[in-house]
Design a protein with these regions (language model features):
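Alpha-helical transmembrane segments and their immediate juxtamembrane cytosolic regions
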Residues: 1-236
Length: 236
């Protein structure tokens, strides 16, 4: 059975991501973009978790998600290749490594698709985590404590692989995150697992527009006052 509020949430996720990556619609320094940056990617991973089914065989899940998530990223990278290599003088080695890394930080012209390969990694990790928790009989409280520890680990690791110079092949390379954006996996996996854990509650939830409007006003007010800087892609 289709649930209207879940379809709305999925649509809003896509809209928020598009708005956040289009400077013509949302200025990077605007209040609206600051508000979107706080929750658009966490919401995306949370919603993805509500649709995750751990009873699917691991190989089937990985194959299906590769078709849905990895393939679009690779297709866009390949389509850009002739233009970037011939007319924009992009370095072939850097382009190849950037494509294989599955991370938009190494391919700035397709950076808006960075979350696709990462989401594939999140589904794989979420399957393994859920199987492990179920096998060892973790209860709700224990799961929540473990997920909170995972979130704290992710925050602690956040600057560890970002803009770090390393020497490789007689050259200095600037590390801009791990392949598949694996350095932010603990954070995204936290939201994904929370969505999976609370999926039944989320599906049964009843929403009141008055409460939603009031919450939105309070949220925007807090962002306007405190001006937090946050974003998984930029590791802040």
């Amino acid at each position: 059975m289709r649930l209207a509020h879940i379809d709305v949430a999925r649509g809003l996720c896509i809209l928020f991501v598009v708005l956040g990556h289009n400077p013509a619609l949302t200025h990077p320094d605007s209040l609206s973009n600051a508000c979107l940056a706080v929750f658009r990617m966490p919401l995306l991973f949370f919603i993805a978790g509500t649709f995750f089914r751990a009873n699917i065989p691991f190989g089937t899940l990985m194959r299906d998600k590769a078709h849905a998530l990895i393939k679009p990223f690779l297709v866009m990278a390949v389509l850009h290749a002739p233009f970037r290599l011939l007319w924009w003088d992009a370095d072939p080695t850097e382009y190849l490594l950037g494509t294989l890394s599955g991370s938009g930080t190494y391919l700035p012209w397709v950076y808006t698709l960075w979350f696709l390969p990462h989401l594939w990694l999140v589904f794989a990790s979420g399957w393994l985590l859920e199987r492990g928790l179920t096998k060892h009989g973790f209860h709700s409280v224990e799961r929540m404590l473990l997920l909170l520890m995972l979130l704290m680990l992710g925050v602690w690791l956040l600057p560890g692989f970002w803009m770090r110079p390393i020497q490789m092949l007689d050259s200095i390379w600037l590390v801009k995150g791990l392949p598949l954006s694996a350095d932010i996996l603990p954070i995204s996996l936290f939201y994904f697992s929370m969505g999976h854990h609370f999926r039944a509650l989320f599906q049964r939830a009843q929403y009141r527009w008055q409460a939603a409007a009031l919450s939105l006003m309070v949220f925007v007010g807090l962002i306007a006052v405190y001006s937090p800087r946050t974003g998984l892609f930029s590791r802040v």
